[in-house]
Amino acid sequence: MSEALGDAASHFTTEAQGERGGIGRYVNVDSVTPVEFLPGLGFRPVLGQRGMANFVSFEPGTEAPRHVHEEEQIVIVVEGEFTFDLDGDVRTMRRGDVAVVPAWVPHGAWTTDSSCLEIDVFVPPRESLLKLAEAQSAEASSAAAQAAGEQEPGGQPGGA
């Protein structure tokens, strides 16, 4: 096992050190309607208070063109593979591979014969995806409120 990171009690503190950031929620990514920004490139963003996770699906033969943005991005490959260009360092990424993209660093990705599912984590949330993510969040909150009305206290479904 690797060396301990430090005092577990301070890492897992139960004492708030500031204002609560809001109310937590659960999201099933399959319930998020995918938006196709380019043919074969589907986005399913999930918005947090200070960050965003975008579940991205690439069909075979799809490209996310080389681009830059002000948000830091962490790319996590969940299944399949794609080729990733990180400022000219081009690599094939597969399940478990992670790329860290600092702000304003050129990057892009493409698939050839296979598909790929990856998660992009943006801090702060990616500006160009905010309206989409906010709409998805509102839709999910509405569905969650409706589902909560159908459950008994303790989270169990109601009914006889």
Locations of the language-model features?
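A short, N-terminal "cap"/entry segment at the start of jelly-roll beta-barrel domains
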Residues: 1-50, 131-160
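Conserved short histidine dyad/triad with adjacent acidic residue
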Residues: 38-39, 53-68
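Structural motif
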Residues: 52, 74, 81-83, 90, ...
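Short, conserved beta-strand element in jelly-roll/cupin
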Residues: 57-59, 68-84
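Short beta-strand His + acidic residue motifs that chelate non-heme Fe in jelly-roll/DSBH
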Residues: 64-66, 84-85, 101, 107-113
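Short acidic-glycine-tyrosine-enriched beta hairpin
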Residues: 89-103
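Ligand-binding loop in jelly-roll beta-barrel domains
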Residues: 103-128
